[in-house]
């Protein structure tokens, strides 16, 4: 135990020992996890299997990352920023076969599918105007309901304010109201971080590999048939093609001349190539209605590998 924590309680002693600069093992684990989050592949894989006989693919890189996280006093946000500004991270994603005997040298990030949460949040931005609507009320929200001038308030006024707060922001009442305002066919259209977990097996997030929270590294990005069917014909796809969704309203208001650009920019974050534009316009014109044509193009873009994978 470091001398600085010699007289502290045991929890503080444990924390001090764990993060001490002489105990590099913990720092290596943290640095390796952040590297994998950014680059798609850890220097040590699996990331929760640090053993003497499981050698890092690049020992020098792991030691450098460990030195950095210790220098930064475990400031994970700063280490993330450093990696994000590196030329390795900013290169085009590379295809890597995990079963290959060849060591990956990190010429760039590994091409990988978005996590379940990333896919969900990407879709929600195309659907909901306020994806944060399920958050707890802010102090300003509560103040607008319980607005009392305590210099002149009496017991009756305080009781009225308390009743108003209970009717508006009591846990059960508030949660039910949020679900009513933000729900569609039993699914809350809010960011993944706002949804209580673990979710039922049939939910979009679980189908795409969200962790069941029963074990470390329980999340998966393995492709399955239900995932394909969900993207083809699931509730989230249906609501996106209806009036009132963000993408639908923006495409319709843009008009035929700009609609294709809006769809490509919103879903794939780039403008269409001349060939892409010709194919999209042809599909829109051949549909039963302009709106149906827009829906067909949106559906096609959502089901591309370009949308699902981080490049």
Please provide the spans of the model-predicted regions.
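Active-site-proximal alpha-helical
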Residues: 35, 227-235
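Primarily short, surface-exposed interaction patches in extracytoplasmic proteins
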Residues: 1-161, 214-218, 238-294, 301, ...
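Residue-level micro-sites within transmembrane alpha helices that shape
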Residues: 226, 302-305
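Residue-level detector of short, conserved catalytic/binding motifs and their immediate flanks
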Residues: 226-227, 295
């Amino acid at each position: 135990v470091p001398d600085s924590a010699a007289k502290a309680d045991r929890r503080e002693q444990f924390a001090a020992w764990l993060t001490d600069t002489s105990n590099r093992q913990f720092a290596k684990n943290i640095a390796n996890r952040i590297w994998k989050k950014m680059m798609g592949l850890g220097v040590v894989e699996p990331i929760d299997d640090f053993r003497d006989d499981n050698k890092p693919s690049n020992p020098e890189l792991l030691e450098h990352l460990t030195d950095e996280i210790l220098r930064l006093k475990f400031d994970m946000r700063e280490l993330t920023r450093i990696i994000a500004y590196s030329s390795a991270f900013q290169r085009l994603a590379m295809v890597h076969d995990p079963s290959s005997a060849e060591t990956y040298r990190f010429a760039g990030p590994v091409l990988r599918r978005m996590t379940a949460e990333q896919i969900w949040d990407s879709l929600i931005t195309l659907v909901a105007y306020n994806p944060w609507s399920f958050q707890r009320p802010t102090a300003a929200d509560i103040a607008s309901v319980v607005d009392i001038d305590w210099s002149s308030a009496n017991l009756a006024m305080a009781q009225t304010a308390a009743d108003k707060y209970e009717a508006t922001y009591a846990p059960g009442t508030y949660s039910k109201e949020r679900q009513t305002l933000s729900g569609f066919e039993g699914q809350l259209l809010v960011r993944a971080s706002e949804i209580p977990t673990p979710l039922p097996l049939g939910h979009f997030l679980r189908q795409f590999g969200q962790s069941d929270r029963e074990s470390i590294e329980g999340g998966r990005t393995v492709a399955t048939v239900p995932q394909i069917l969900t993207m083809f014909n699931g509730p989230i796809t249906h609501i996106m093609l209806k009036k009132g969704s963000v993408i639908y309203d923006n495409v319709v208001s843009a008009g035929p001349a700009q609609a294709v650009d809006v769809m490509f920019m919103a879903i794939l974050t780039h403008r269409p190539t001349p060939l892409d534009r010709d194919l999209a316009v042809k599909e829109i014109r051949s549909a039963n209605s302009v709106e149906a044509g827009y829906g067909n193009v949106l559906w096609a873009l959502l089901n591309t590998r370009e949308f699902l994978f981080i490049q």
